[in-house]
From Swiss-Prot:
Pathway listed: Cofactor biosynthesis; coenzyme A biosynthesis
Taxon lineage: Archaea, Methanobacteriati, Methanobacteriota, Thermococci, Thermococcales
Reactions catalysed: (R)-4'-phosphopantetheine + ATP + H(+) = 3'-dephospho-CoA + diphosphate
Cited SUPFAM superfamilies: Nucleotidylyl transferase
Family the UniProt entry places it in: Belongs to the eukaryotic CoaD family.
Keyword vocabulary terms for this entry: ATP-binding, Coenzyme A biosynthesis, Cytoplasm, Nucleotide-binding, Nucleotidyltransferase, Transferase
Protein's recorded name: Phosphopantetheine adenylyltransferase
Length: 158
């Protein structure tokens, strides 16, 4: 039995890597229905190596493919334009799944929910997934060509 009826998770999900997959797996482990906030192209313009971020439609396609391959059911993907997204509009959300790195974002979401009279979400935190180099696996490092989506160091181009 799932702990929560409705949980939320959000991100850019650019070049789906082990960290993204762990986050999504945890959300489906604890939630019956998972609301996934997927950042718009507009929202990612300030990220490192923004020019290399895949377009929204491609990220959406890759995300759906991952969900289907893993046979995850009961999800809604919603485009978001800011860190709060739809979390103040869906009253019945119960929990938010974040990484250690994005925990502060969950606090911002809860503050916004409280400001509009909604119950704060229970925060579920997963550990950061490390690369073989010892640093966290991140889309920024993948876009920079330093690691692959599995955390393996990229071989220098000769």
């Amino acid at each position: 039995m799932k702990r929560f009826k409705k949980v939320v998770v959000g991100g850019t999900f650019d070049r789906l890597h082990l960290g993204h997959k762990a986050l999504l797996r945890k959300a489906f482990e604890v939630g019956k229905i998972v609301y996934i906030g997927l950042t718009s192209d507009e929202m990612v313009k300030e990220k490192p190596y923004a020019e290399k971020i895949l377009p929204y439609e491609r990220r959406l396609k890759d995300l759906i493919e991952f969900l289907e391959v893993n046979n995850f059911k009961g999800y809604r993907i919603i485009k978001i334009n800011n860190a709060i997204g739809f979390t103040t509009e869906i009253r019945s959300l119960e929990a938010i799944v974040v990484s250690e790195e994005t925990y502060k974002g969950a606090l911002i979401v809860n503050r916004a929910r409280e400001e509009v009279g909604l119950k704060p979400l229970e925060i579920i935190v997963i550990p950061i997934i490390k690369s073989k180099l010892g640093c966290k696996i991140s889309s920024s490092l993948i876009r920079a060509g330093l690691i692959d989506p599995f955390g393996n160091p990229m071989k220098p181009r000769s």
